């Protein structure tokens, strides 16, 4: 028995990090009786430990709620809780495409932030109806009226029907449920009689059931025992279970048009279930697939190596398991003279990189070292071909390269105007080009074009420290453009260290090189001979530091006597040191690499 689609509401919650959207989801589940009170815990939908600790949502989660409205009808509300962070924007886009409306949650004490804007525009692009919800109105610093004005000015949507709530205490949450039923539309299209057409919203790996696929039915009926086909990959599967999340997994007989639920079909890998793909029935396929999603492209690359070489196989297995669950993460093997065997990994952004590294260390008990993050450069070769460069150590000979292009981003920064000067300075320092500046009350919104290379290092940390944590930042990839980029190598005792080489803009090369040499000088222990540490571009040395040699006091046993006796001993020592320097190898401890790489970020 399928549900009349007029009584279905599919919606997502759009908000900036920390504006309380997972807490609001908890309250909605509690008030509609989705879980018993004893089963409730904070952030029910954030199932990973790391999500709960950092207070962020990474994987989009879904839940089906039954709500008896004031008009006496019972509605089915399908909530998709989306991530708020810029790196996981692809999770947001696929979740939004499965819904018809969104709750826009804004913190009444902080107002509109950069990521609120990015996600709202995505919702508007998907032609969503929006219900404005002002959260945290019980805080002493809350200014709901000012924030309403700000929403109207910045986003340009009507806030006369905005709902004021406190998700923590539950105040105003029943009004949100009423607003969902009243203001959001039911699914627009869908016919039970049409051939099966289902949108694949998300998928994740379960040790017992294989891949669990989150789906939104558009046409037809999805039931157990059907043979389905993925239109993107052409692979066929037999549906074994059909169900919904309440947020517990509950099996149902069928899913009809407009409904959101899950299926399992003994699928082995998440990579087989491409998000945004269309699922249809093998026996009676639909004519055309849904307008497809782009598979997520990695933006930031870095090398990940085990500190203990014996952990290499464990790392390979762990990465394979994470890949099961995260199709946007890619990796391939690489070797480094300094760090041994490891992997070159691609990520959606810096937070994604940090989270994958932390999950590898935490869930699989591995000790890892990550090289400095780099972006994908395009090399225009003299023979007319174009090569992509993921690792600065693989840079071809500059004689063969006619030009190098680097990726640029369009960054939006929202900040209280007190910190504006320092933030503009930071953007200029990072080769930024200002595109726009506007004021909303006491907050400024700045738009800059920035090279991604300058952002992946420590831009976010610097921005937060300059603005004492008040500025928020969001970016979209724009395009590649040519830059005066050079490969900077670090030489220790005349030998190049591949793990520390990086591509930098010529104007900042000297500064970066000097700071790297100074750090290494403190980190590499003294040897019996002096060690030069140099930063070089091609054959030109741009910075140098020297680690002094350890030396024994050879003249200690001379009491008085002729000065030539002392000189002879000192000359002999000098001769030995010189020979040592020719044949001696510099031992660079692993800890020095780890520290240098940490700092170079």
UniProtKB/Swiss-Prot annotation:
Residues 6-188 form the tr-type G domain. One of its GO terms (molecular function) is translation elongation factor activity. It is a peripheral membrane protein. Keywords: Cell inner membrane, Cell membrane, GTP-binding, Hydrolase, Membrane, Nucleotide-binding, Protein biosynthesis. Coiled coil: none annotated. One of its GO terms (cellular component) is plasma membrane. It catalyses: GTP + H2O = GDP + phosphate + H(+). GO terms for biological process: positive regulation of translation. GTP binds at residues 18-23, 135-138. Its EC number is 3.6.5.n1. The keyword Ribonucleoprotein does not apply. The keyword Protein biosynthesis applies. It comes from the Bacteria. InterPro entries: EF-4, EFG_III/V, EFG_V-like, EFTu-like_2, G_TR_CS, LepA_C_sf, LepA_CTD, LepA_IV. Its main location: membrane. Belongs to the TRAFAC class translation factor GTPase superfamily. Classic translation factor GTPase family. LepA subfamily. Required for accurate and efficient protein synthesis under certain stress conditions. May act as a fidelity factor of the translation reaction, by catalyzing a one-codon backward translocation of tRNAs on improperly translocated ribosomes. Back-translocation proceeds from a post-translocation (POST) complex to a pre-translocation (PRE) complex, thus giving elongation factor G a second chance to translocate the tRNAs correctly. Binds to ribosomes in a GTP-dependent manner. This is Elongation factor 4. The lineage of its organism: Bacteria, Pseudomonadati, Pseudomonadota, Alphaproteobacteria, Hyphomicrobiales. The gene is lepA.
């Amino acid at each position: 028995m399928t549900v009349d689609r007029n009584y279905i509401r599919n919606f997502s919650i759009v908000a900036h990090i920390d504006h309380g959207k997972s807490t609001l989801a908890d309250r909605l589940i509690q008030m509609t009786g989705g879980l018993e009170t004893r089963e409730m815990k904070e952030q029910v939908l954030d199932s990973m430990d790391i999500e709960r600790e950092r207070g962020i949502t990474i994987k989009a989660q879904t839940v089906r709620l039954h709500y008896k409205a004031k008009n006496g009808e019972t509605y089915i509300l399908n909530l998709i809780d989306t991530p708020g962070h810029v790196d996981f924007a692809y999770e947001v886009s696929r979740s939004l495409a499965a819904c018809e409306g969104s709750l826009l949650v804004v913190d009444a004490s902080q107002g509109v932030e950069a990521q609120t804007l990015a996600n709202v525009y995505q919702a508007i692009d998907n032609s969503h109806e929006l219900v404005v919800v002002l959260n945290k109105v019980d805080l002493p610093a809350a200014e709901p009226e000012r924030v309403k004005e700000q929403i109207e000015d910045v986003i340009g949507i009507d806030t006369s029907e905005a709902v004021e709530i406190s998700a923590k205490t539950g105040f105003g949450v029943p009004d949100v449920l009423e607003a969902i039923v009243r203001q959001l539309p039911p699914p627009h299209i869908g016919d039970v009689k049409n051939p099966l057409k289902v949108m694949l919203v998300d998928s994740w790996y379960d040790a017992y059931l294989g891949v669990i696929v989150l789906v939104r039915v558009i046409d037809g009926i999805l039931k157990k025992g059907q043979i389905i086909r993925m239109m993107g990959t052409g692979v066929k599967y037999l549906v074994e279970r059909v169900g919904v999340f309440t947020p517990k997994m509950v099996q149902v007989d069928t899913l009809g048009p407009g409904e959101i639920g899950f299926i399992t079909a003994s699928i082995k890998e998440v990579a087989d279930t491409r998000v945004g793909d269309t699922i249809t029935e093998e026996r009676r396929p639909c004519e055309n697939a849904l307008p497809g999603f782009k598979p997520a492209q990695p933006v930031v690359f870095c090398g990940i190596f085990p500190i203990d070489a014996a952990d290499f196989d464990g790392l390979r297995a762990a990465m394979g398991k994470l890949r099961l669950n995260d199709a946007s993460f890619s990796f391939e093997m690489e070797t480094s003279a300094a760090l041994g065997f490891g992997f070159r990994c691609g990520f959606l952004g810096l937070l994604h990189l940090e989270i994958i590294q932390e999950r590898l260390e935490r869930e699989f008990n591995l000790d890892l070292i990550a090289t400095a993050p780099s972006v994908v450069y395009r090399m225009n070769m003299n023979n007319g071909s174009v090569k992509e460069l993921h690792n600065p150590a693989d840079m071809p000979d500059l004689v063969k390269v006619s030009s190098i292009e680097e990726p640029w981003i369009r960054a939006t920064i929202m900040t209280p105007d007190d910190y504006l000067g320092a933030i503009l300075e930071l953007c200029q320092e990072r080769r930024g080009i200002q595109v726009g500046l506007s004021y909303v009350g006491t907050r400024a919104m700045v738009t800059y074009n920035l090279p991604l290379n300058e952002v992946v290092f420590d831009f976010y940390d610097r921005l937060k420290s300059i603005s004492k944590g008040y500025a928020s930042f969001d970016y979209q990839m724009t395009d590649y453009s040519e830059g005066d980029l050079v490969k900077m190598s670090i030489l220790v005792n005349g030998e190049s260290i591949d793990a520390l080489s990086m591509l930098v803009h010529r104007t900042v090369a000297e500064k970066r090189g000097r700071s790297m040499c100074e750090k290494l000088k403190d980190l590499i222990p003294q040897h019996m001979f002096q060690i030069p540490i140099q930063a070089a571009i091609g054959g030109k040395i741009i910075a140098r530091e020297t680690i002094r040699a350890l030396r024994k006091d050879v003249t200690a046993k001379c009491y008085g006597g002729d000065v030539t006796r002392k000189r002879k001993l000192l000359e002999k020592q000098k001769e030995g040191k010189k020979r040592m320097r020719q044949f001696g190898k510099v031992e660079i401890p692993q800890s020095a690499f780890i520290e240098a790489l940490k700092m170079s970020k």
